């Protein structure tokens, strides 16, 4: 074999494939020990692998314990990018009220909403309905987790706004915070916002009792899909400006159909169950 050919073979045999220097540099810059600076206060940048792990872990954890609001919040942030939270942000940008919300950046908390003022409003007003729901469920406006894992600062606010408005959705629909009520409301939110977390939360229906699952499939699922698709996008509601409006008028304006009172249904079912047990014991004795 000619020397030049042998030399060429040796040269090919010693070739090494190297990554572009820019790729190596970016990988070094974005490691667990050396992250890029946050884009806003409290922001925690994540790699694609970390975001996937967060999504899987929080999904499993929240399914095992649907009351873990922190895991549900993490699941919402991990699955909202790269598409869905931008779609929701664009829906706000295409709406005059949504644009004002993005410009004003209002927050919903006990510091921005006076509970005393809300209780002074007419019984059928949005504000009174909201505070009455808070009192009945034993919760407050400060219970929402702060967004940390969404990279875009404006989209982080959109997620925060959705999160802080969640209790208004509860109040307007009348759904309680029991797992059955949360699954029904999350189904409505999925049809209305398309956020993946709201759709994934529907898997919690597996943890419901048989009679609750039957009620979900026959009553709440059809209501949620019908009302969620037909109503205007609730992310564009400036709730702070609707507090004095009649709640039925707002439902009609948004196209939201109120479902049957779930708490009353559950109370009635418990009474019927107790009556049946009492009758059975009386018959046996």
From Swiss-Prot:
The keyword Zinc applies. Its EC number is 4.1.1.130. It holds the Pfam family Coq4. Its cofactor is Zn(2+). It is an enzyme of class 4 (lyase). It is a peripheral membrane protein. Zn(2+) binds at residues 166-167, 170, 182. GO terms for cellular component: extrinsic component of mitochondrial inner membrane. GO terms for biological process: ubiquinone biosynthetic process. InterPro entries: Coq4 (IPR007715), Coq4_euk (IPR027540). Its main location: mitochondrion. Keywords: Lyase, Membrane, Metal-binding, Mitochondrion, Mitochondrion inner membrane, Transit peptide, Ubiquinone biosynthesis, Zinc. Pathway: Cofactor biosynthesis; ubiquinone biosynthesis. Residues 1-11 form a transit peptide. It catalyses: a 4-hydroxy-3-methoxy-5-(all-trans-polyprenyl)benzoate + H(+) = a 2-methoxy-6-(all-trans-polyprenyl)phenol + CO2. It is found in: Mitochondrion inner membrane. Lyase that catalyzes the C1-decarboxylation of 4-hydroxy-3-methoxy-5-(all-trans-polyprenyl)benzoic acid into 2-methoxy-6-(all-trans-polyprenyl)phenol during ubiquinone biosynthesis. Belongs to the COQ4 family. Component of a multi-subunit COQ enzyme complex, composed of at least COQ3, COQ4, COQ5, COQ6, COQ7 and COQ9. This is Ubiquinone biosynthesis protein COQ4, mitochondrial. It comes from Paracoccidioides brasiliensis (strain Pb03).
